[in-house]
Amino acid sequence: MTAKALEGIRVLDMTHVQSGPSATQLLAWLGADVVKLEAPHGDITRGQLRDLPDVDSLYFTMLNCNKRSITLNTKSERGKEILTELIRRSDVMVENFGPGAVDRMGFTWDRVKEINPRIVYASIKGFGEGPYTAFKAYEVVAQAMGGSMSTTGFEDGPPLATGAQIGDSGTGVHVVAGILAALYQREHTGRGQRVNVAMQHAVLNLCRVKLRDQQRLSHGPLAEYPNEDFGDEVPRSGNASGGGQPGWAVKCAPGGPNDYVYVIVQPVGWQPLSELIGRPELAEDPEWATPRARLPKLNKMFQLIEEWSSTLPKWEVLERLNAHNIPCGPILSTKEIIEDDSLVANEMVVTVPHPERGEFVTVGSPLKLSDSPVEVTSSPLLGEHNEEVYVGELGLGDEELRLLKSSGVI
């Protein structure tokens, strides 16, 4: 069997909820041995948003595949001793507790690197150093303070959260990049290092084009935005692409909530598009023929396209536009996505067996490595690997394991 990309890398996963588990799950998919350390009562998401009684929720199972689970009360003295040994044996340690929580356990960065000078210690917090450092953050808080919400929505409406989990899972991806870079640098230096990623910072990185436009505003209105008024900050612009090529979501038949196709109008696409919508004369009309001429009339342009698209189902609109190499995509509902044969074939929508809840559907790995294929396996039951890790790897005796359990240490 082919060795995995991160085979031999041991990850001590002290994360919970979403931002941290999304990162460590990616590491597990890449072949790392990820040991999820949970309090004896377990990660809170095991019981959150349950769809079935008395089993791990989808919230938990979909973020913790391919991991092992151990339980440990890190507030107890024996728990701290065991945690010390786990740190000593690990290549990577990841946590996303509230600010200062791990330090208060007695495991500051100075202490951690004293235990294991080669360890890469990654932390996720809401904010960087400064006035917000001690503040708690959740997904939408990070969106609010990272530039996403103020620029999402329509001009005359309130700021909106995006459905994409850019604050949590988006931060997780950034953490993985930092961990991999630190592991690579360790090959040259022989020592580990601290990796810190703030959720606000990760969201801002994903919103950088809006910071670009903030600076462009000083030179005049943003012509590619459909907005009528511009102040001194980047406005919400609905479904406008905000890029060099204008785009919009146009309605399709029969008019359901997701009967839309997003269309990008490139310069080369205007001539075939004008023919498709039954207005071939616009390809030569100087009022419409060039991107510069169309720019002040983007709303009218997409209105003309919608007059055509609204008479056809979105899949037919997709087919006709793609026949002319016009960039577009139908708005897919979550039901359509979970039933999409191509996503199943690409192992992006995968069915995973679970020992208690039966099969569940989850997202597969978007990272496709030719020499390190991913097989998504079930999330672990709470403490499922206690004996395997504590007895088989740390060398504790069976009797001590029983005492640890009866005394609430594990």
UniProtKB/Swiss-Prot annotation:
Record: residues binding substrate: G243, G244, Q245
One BP term from GO: oxalate catabolic process
GO molecular function ontology, one term from the record: formyl-CoA transferase activity
Coiled-coil region: none
Region Disordered, annotated ranges: 221-245
UniProt-listed SUPFAM superfamilies: CoA-transferase family III (CaiB/BaiF)
Positions with a binding annotation for CoA: Q18, S19, L72, N73, T74, K75, N96, F97, G98, R104, K136, A137, Y138, E139
Pathway(s) annotated for this protein in UniProt: Metabolic intermediate degradation; oxalate degradation; CO(2) and formate from oxalate: step 1/2
InterPro entries attached to this UniProt entry: CoA-transferase_III_domain, CoA-Trfase_fam_III, CoA-Trfase_III_dom3_sf, CoA-Trfase_III_dom_1_sf, Formyl_CoA_transfer
Function, in words: Involved in the catabolism of oxalate and in the adapatation to low pH via the induction of the oxalate-dependent acid tolerance response (ATR). Catalyzes the transfer of the CoA moiety from formyl-CoA to oxalate.
Family the entry assigns: Belongs to the CoA-transferase III family. Frc subfamily.
Subunit text: Homodimer.
Protein name: Formyl-CoA:oxalate CoA-transferase
Organism of derivation: Streptomyces coelicolor (strain ATCC BAA-471 / A3(2) / M145)
Organism lineage string: Bacteria, Bacillati, Actinomycetota, Actinomycetes, Kitasatosporales
Gene: frc
